[in-house]
Amino acid sequence: MYGFEALTFNIHGGYLEAIVRGHRAGLLTTADYNNLCQCENLDDIKMHLSATKYGSYLQNEPSPLHTTTIVEKCTLKLVDDYKHMLCQATEPMSTFLEYIRYGHMIDNVVLIVTGTLHERDVQELIEKCHPLGMFDSIATLAVAQNMRELYRLVLVDTPLAPYFSECLTSEDLDDMNIEIMRNTLYKAYLEDFYKFCQKLGGATAEIMSDLLAFEADRRAVNITINSIGTELTREDRKKLYSNFGLLYPYGHEELAICEDIDQVRGVMEKYPPYQAIFSKMSYGESQMLDKAFYEEEVRRLCLAFEQQFHYAVFFAYMRLREQEIRNLMWISECVAQNQKSRIHDSVVYMF
């Protein structure tokens, strides 16, 4: 359904919406994936990708290729598309596009802090960071000993600063506290993004509410499964769940007390949209859960393109391109390690 935004959307957003729909048309199809799965080596993959949007990014790469090179160059395509859209955008679209970066910024902070804890080289860690999540003071994250220092020395001048209000403790950074920090930051980020989209109203609010609610629910399930058998209490677990989504609040109450994967399954099967996801798994199995969630996410992201005059297409395109890069990384790894029998295990088809 279109509201009054359809009358004026094209003044500032029409050009960029046309651009992003053009980018979407360049995503790999099932036929492309079938061809890639037949490749015998990474040079074959490069040859198949030469006819796609990635061609110009890979054409000057010498043999022998490595999986990391393919992923790096494909990610560069994503970053270039994003930067082009951002520099053309006006408010409030530019703020919406900035929100898309924040998840990568959180991941980069966690990567640097965790790596430093395990005495990894800072420069090596920075090279592994996602380019969309980079910020000026990222290298100085290594000096922080606890959450307060992390905030005071580094993050106070970044867009993540407001999300740190829940994690400002003097406890030393260890693996458990870093994971709690990651999930607390993500909770604050998702809730903030959700509120921003609600303020925008119209089709943007409607479609983004569905996409962000799905993300919040998926994170709630993953937090529950990953915290089974750890020292995280039920109350601590519940604090990490986002305060919106299909599971909020009653599903959260039930997830907080789950003690194994089958109990999680029992909770999720009460919610029809998630029933199909869990029906694909055997009892006691969680290995295929990530793929099932990714497939459902891709289905919802593709539906975002069925309507016009809204910002959700930008979010959907970025997520679909990220999924495509995950697919290419998996295919490349399977080919490089001669594990072609497993090549279809993690590929999520889009079109």
From Swiss-Prot:
Keywords on record: Hydrogen ion transport, Ion transport, Membrane, Transport, Vacuole
Location(s), subcellular: Vacuole membrane
Protein's UniProt keywords contain Transport: yes
GO MF annotation: an example: proton-transporting ATPase activity, rotational mechanism
Pfam families: vATP-synt_AC39
A GO-annotated cellular component: vacuole
Coiled coil regions in record: none
Function: Subunit of the integral membrane V0 complex of vacuolar ATPase. Vacuolar ATPase is responsible for acidifying a variety of intracellular compartments in eukaryotic cells, thus providing most of the energy required for transport processes in the vacuolar system.
Subunit structure: V-ATPase is a heteromultimeric enzyme composed of a peripheral catalytic V1 complex (components A to H) attached to an integral membrane V0 proton pore complex (components: a, c, c'', d and e).
This protein's name: V-type proton ATPase subunit d1
Species of origin: Arabidopsis thaliana
Organism placement in taxonomy: Eukaryota, Viridiplantae, Streptophyta, Embryophyta, Tracheophyta
Gene behind the chain: VHA-d1
